[in-house]
Amino acid sequence: MLRRVTVAAVCATRRKLCEAGRELAALWGIETRGRCEDSAAARPFPILAMPGRNKAKSTCSCPDLQPNGQDLGENSRVARLGADESEEEGRRGSLSNAGDPEIVKSPSDPKQYRYIKLQNGLQALLISDLSNMEGKTGNTTDDEEEEEVEEEEEDDDEDSGAEIEDDDEEGFDDEDEFDDEHDDDLDTEDNELEELEERAEARKKTTEKQSAAALCVGVGSFADPDDLPGLAHFLEHMVFMGSLKYPDENGFDAFLKKHGGSDNASTDCERTVFQFDVQRKYFKEALDRWAQFFIHPLMIRDAIDREVEAVDSEYQLARPSDANRKEMLFGSLARPGHPMGKFFWGNAETLKHEPRKNNIDTHARLREFWMRYYSSHYMTLVVQSKETLDTLEKWVTEIFSQIPNNGLPRPNFGHLTDPFDTPAFNKLYRVVPIRKIHALTITWALPPQQQHYRVKPLHYISWLVGHEGKGSILSFLRKKCWALALFGGNGETGFEQNSTYSVFSISITLTDEGYEHFYEVAYTVFQYLKMLQKLGPEKRIFEEIRKIEDNEFHYQEQTDPVEYVENMCENMQLYPLQDILTGDQLLFEYKPEVIGEALNQLVPQKANLVLLSGANEGKCDLKEKWFGTQYSIEDIENSWAELWNSNFELNPDLHLPAENKYIATDFTLKAFDCPETEYPVKIVNTPQGCLWYKKDNKFKIPKAYIRFHLISPLIQKSAANVVLFDIFVNILTHNLAEPAYEADVAQLEYKLVAGEHGLIIRVKGFNHKLPLLFQLIIDYLAEFNSTPAVFTMITEQLKKTYFNILIKPETLAKDVRLLILEYARWSMIDKYQALMDGLSLESLLSFVKEFKSQLFVEGLVQGNVTSTESMDFLKYVVDKLNFKPLEQEMPVQFQVVELPSGHHLCKVKALNKGDANSEVTVYYQSGTRSLREYTLMELLVMHMEEPCFDFLRTKQTLGYHVYPTCRNTSGILGFSVTVGTQATKYNSEVVDKKIEEFLSSFEEKIENLTEEAFNTQVTALIKLKECEDTHLGEEVDRNWNEVVTQQYLFDRLAHEIEALKSFSKSDLVNWFKAHRGPGSKMLSVHVVGYGKYELEEDGTPSSEDSNSSCEVMQLTYLPTSPLLADCIIPITDIRAFTTTLNLLPYHKIVK
């Protein structure tokens, strides 16, 4: 599969995978750091983690301000103050919102753009979004701003922010930003519901769509001094810690949290990016506070010592990721002295202990680095708000002109080409991974490709190499049962594409049999590439890609402003003015010679092979310095080396893809055939199913969303049934991969999810050809079958998937928590054991037959579709599957146990002996509550968010991931505080006590809260809930969440807003005290890592030196230490504990 991105998805810190490929990547163990969502330019495998500040990772990108080292605006104006403004007035006439016509934008984009260059050299892009303003221009008053409906979007930053989770609908929520395998469970849990809940609820913790800013400094980790590895990343952290004008250490975060905002930063190889968003009313003040990072940050010594620990925790979280390990190993292959070989992360050793030993003053060096490299003429700034361009220009000029310009040239690494032109590169590297996986990655180091952005040669090659249709590499390997997934291309991170080189990688997830034939797999890749080289670039293929990308750009949906500005500030460093918005998406010119030049370098003699497998253990005698990766270096076997060096034959089964029949050509907006409604209405209701429908009349794009939930009571009857269902959905996905791939690349996306209570089918894209894809999916479902070879291949991979989920502390902690709370839930360990006990193909086919025989089907169709067409979708499902209705109505949730009063602790050992990371969650159960109380809980957690981060992370330095969470567990409310820590630094019980200490201090804090501060927070939450949707997908997600949970409260936000308006400070204080008092129901879950502060069962300190995981997947309960022994009730057998508890009634939060 190739990588595809939209304009928003390119953003550095949002490393999401394409929905169509994410579940495959996860199941098959591909470590993807993709930044894709809907489509556009190809993105490769792997996109790897890089250091970031606190909520997301950094990306590595390309270097110079422009490909030719020029400013964006050779012919553009410099922003002026005072009298010079009249000159600009004459240039644009009297319009206060006239944009720059030379900036090419999508016809669907309502925003206006203006480029300015300040007198200090800083370049800025101003974005005015006055859409939905009903003719308003200019500055609105504060009163208007208070009443104005404002927009927002989702935010994926969960490590320090308040979260709202639907536990019943979550998969594994706390995405580890450094863990590329965080989606391993996408095909094995009801992640469809988790994603919906996270998207819908994350919107409530983000900001107004209209107000966001991002600044890119054109310097990154390549500039790290040799004696202080990680200094650039550390500086990115430290500028947040107070400024001369605003000295409070956590002041900026506190200001944003108070006004519904969020912020983040990321360090790249040659760039560093900062971004934030906030309610429009507070945007100017936020800009002023934020600009102080670059004007006069304090960086006091005391803060330095504490923030080193945050950087170190970030590094510790990154260590168990195979993607990060592979990246560090790959970098170590660079020739000596090349910056690709640097340790970008930094840790306590490189930033504190070693400097002290060598009499290096980190504080002084940090300030020197800031003065040398944080210069205004290296910076590109993007601001977006619902203000006029003139207003934004005035603000930016006034605030950001204060950033100093040192006049020094930016460091240039462009002369350091060919970093991997070494004898060690063209070898076979065997690597022992953390997870259970077989994977082969073939990599070539090419000359820098950024200057060819108008042709995008690597995108063209990725399109073909990553194709999954007939004649493709993956199609051939799947037929042999040697491979499960393939990702190819370049991720456009700075690690993969910079001023010194560009990478092209092909990574293949192998089956057990494929591992045994990995040389043949590599040979198949080389045969395909030789076929492409022999044919040469094909204009038909190029034009097909261009047409698809042009369609997507023309009908582009709006995106989250904070992601958008982040992407744009990086684009300003890469593309000329006219291509800022298009340079990363569109194919402009067909130049076969440019494509051919890149293609002809992809030969076996220049390839690096990395083979990941647990079978390599014992064969690898080398160890990478920073991440401890075990590996070995071998020459390519002589017989294969000789074959690859010869004029080998082509494979007749490998050929170019046929013409794509799924590309849309009809973009007509359809007329209504029934009355327009604000919310979905039920247009079909039968014993076999029902259908909800809403015709879009807001976004006016020729796209549609189709969602169906095929509900069956059969799934949850046993752990074996749950596993059979997982196998079924994954084989169905496997069967569809080849025939549906053309639809996927034509922007028609689909996803099949093995939900807790049924099969979830999601389809979206241009409505013209969408019915073809939907019918294809239902046809394959109706005619489901599997060969013994495919069954064996899928079950073996599923064992690895379950294992890889369980060895992550955060996902094991969730599994344990939900196993305690949800009655009759089958845990991941139960599923793993059922799979290990053995299941047959016959049992699968029998299960599928029974599953399809009796169902209730519930659907939602929204977008550019008529009601008649919508009903046809449901009719097709019913007619094709020909099933009987369910005998009785089936709840789509679990029953939840009622926790006894008191503090209960379940403490278990992590399953990865090489992982120091621990996860500590303290949960308070509330019970069956009303919608009003649910909203009050949201408000509580919103108040809790910033002080929680400040106390537990900033001051106590307990860990990198620290956050409070609202929890909705099958309709039962609660809240929790989670800290990710390390056993090399803290005992989990110490962390638990610190969480309790925080909660006690928080009680005092809210008691002393002023009415003004309380009302400010209420207003902020109301604003977030009032925000209009940015694009149709957000509205669909929110409505689908109501359908799939069978709550149907489509105007939920309006009810929550009304509830918020009725709250008083005493409501908040009393609610919190009631849940913290003597009768509180408290559950602590500890997953304990390996390190000197944690003990083994025999009382000896545990060690994290091992690189292995437990082969027997079972919970190891740990005793409570004297620290908590007097105040807690230990849980040492979950089943025994829960069988004694009462069950709460099924409950839905609808009143």
Swiss-Prot record:
A single BP term in Gene Ontology: positive regulation of axonogenesis
Cystine bridges: none
Residues the record lists as binding Zn(2+): 233, 237, 314
Cofactor: binding details: Binds 1 zinc ion per subunit.
Biased composition (Acidic residues): 141-198
Signal sequence coordinates: 1-20
Enzymatic reactions: Hydrolysis of polypeptides, preferably at -Xaa-|-Arg-Lys-, and less commonly at -Arg-|-Arg-Xaa-, in which Xaa is not Arg or Lys
Tissues of expression: Primarily in adult heart, skeletal muscle, and testis and at much lower levels in other tissues.
Keyword annotations from UniProtKB, A to Z: Cell projection, Hydrolase, Metal-binding, Metalloprotease, Mitochondrion, Phosphoprotein, Protease, Signal, Zinc
Family: Belongs to the peptidase M16 family.
Protein name in the entry: Nardilysin
Source species of the chain: Homo sapiens (Human)
